[in-house]
Amino acid sequence: AEMAIQAIESGHHVVIEKPMALTLADAEKVVYTSLRFRKQVFCVMQNRYSPPSVWIKEMVESGKLGQIYMVQLNCYWNRDERYYKPGGWHGDAALDGGTLFTQFSHFIDIMYWLFGDICNIQTHFADFNHEKLTAFEDSGFVNFNFVNGGMGSLSYSTAVWDKNLESSMLIVAENGSVKIGGQYMNEVEYCHIKDYEMPELAPTNPGNDYGPYKGSAQNHNFVIRNVVNVLSGAPGEIITTNVLEGMKVVDIIRRIYAGKSVK
């Protein structure tokens, strides 16, 4: 956030990798500075461009699913000593922020993008095998309600052995059920919806390969294209993930972490 503010004050538009900040106060400073200097802020949430994400967004907004009853978000990845190396920022509470900020904010963003804000949050956290690697939890269960109706849950862990397991979203709704799965929500695994036939989606780009560990989909080219189109005034082009949406993800994660005690 500090570097983004400095860039804006120097007269530049900015692109901010997730998360845009680690505290709501810092996120608000970015918003205030961007308004004061009339500069655009682009938040990087490239999973919004994956074909399953684009498809489910249209399904929700069109009302084809009807009332949303339940949403279950599961994020099970591997992040071990190959990732949390001594002397780096990974695992540092002040610089990393926690597992939800650095690893899984993409998927919290997708959930917020689809279903809106959450409330009535209940949490349970644990640190199974990262005591010597990080200053925070590696796993958690989170239950909540959606402000717009329905209930949800988030189950996550970086304690998975050796490699990523999955990032998935299961939706139970009035008119049917959907499950999007794979290592980074890259494929539709189940679709059974009233009076609807599932179309064939374009293939999802592979995940970012960092050698000993893997990340989310390689969609950053779409983010950069959006930046260029918006700043060049392309007709109808808007920021894919704007600064207020980036701030909302920070807000949701901070509320999940509020009063956290790790066992």
Question: Which role does the model predict for each range below?
Answer:
Residues G211-R225, T241:
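Active-site loop of classical SDR/Rossmann-like NAD(P)-dependent oxidoreductases
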Residues N47-L133:
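Predominantly a Rossmann-like dinucleotide-binding segment in NAD(P)-dependent oxidoreductases
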Residues T102, I108-E187, I224-A234:
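Contiguous beta-strand/loop segments that form the cofactor/metal-binding neighborhood of enzyme cores
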Residues K39, G66-M70, I256-K263:
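C-terminal capping/lid region of NAD(P)-dependent oxidoreductase domains
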Residues A1-R48, G63:
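Beta-strand-loop-alpha-helix segment that lines the small-molecule cofactor/substrate pocket
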Residues A4, A27, S53, F107-I108, ...:
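A general structural signal for well-ordered alpha-helical segments in protein cores
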Residues G11-H12, P86-A94, A202-D209:
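Short glycine/proline- and charge-enriched loop/turn segments
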Residues E28, V147, R225-K263:
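C-terminal helix-rich "cap/oligomerization" subdomain common to oxidoreductases
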